[in-house]
């Protein structure tokens, strides 16, 4: 059997840069900030150390999360004016004591965004979430340590 080796730092760095390009495509400011942070982290830990494999693994996992789980919302053009009008109505309602918070305004503003979902985004269905964990049983024994609470049937 061949032992699996951790990728080298250059491979992890390139993988992270590719992930930022995919996740933040079209948003130059965020893309630049993410790449600058990646470079800063790699430069700070340039010398080999005991924790180098752990840091490389962290970079690979971060890249995977960026690539598969980060979705950006783009404000829909023309929605800004409607959102401003809606916000001013809420301010008036709050002044009259009809409305207490800003949650409704935030929800309305968030609804006026278009999500940029690309082909790498991990997709799931709600059915798998609803049925998750229904077939598993856990026995709790009274008087035992926490590490001994689970047992298989």
Curated annotation (Swiss-Prot):
One of its GO terms (molecular function) is protein folding chaperone. It comes from the Eukaryota. Keywords: Chaperone, Mitochondrion, Transit peptide. Signal peptide: none annotated. One of its GO terms (biological process) is mitochondrial respiratory chain complex III assembly. Belongs to the complex I LYR family. MZM1 subfamily. Assembly factor required for Rieske Fe-S protein RIP1 incorporation into the cytochrome b-c1 (CIII) complex. Functions as a chaperone, binding to this subunit within the mitochondrial matrix and stabilizing it prior to its translocation and insertion into the late CIII dimeric intermediate within the mitochondrial inner membrane. Modulates the mitochondrial matrix zinc pool. This is Mitochondrial zinc maintenance protein 1, mitochondrial. It comes from Ajellomyces capsulatus (strain G186AR / H82 / ATCC MYA-2454 / RMSCC 2432). The gene is MZM1.
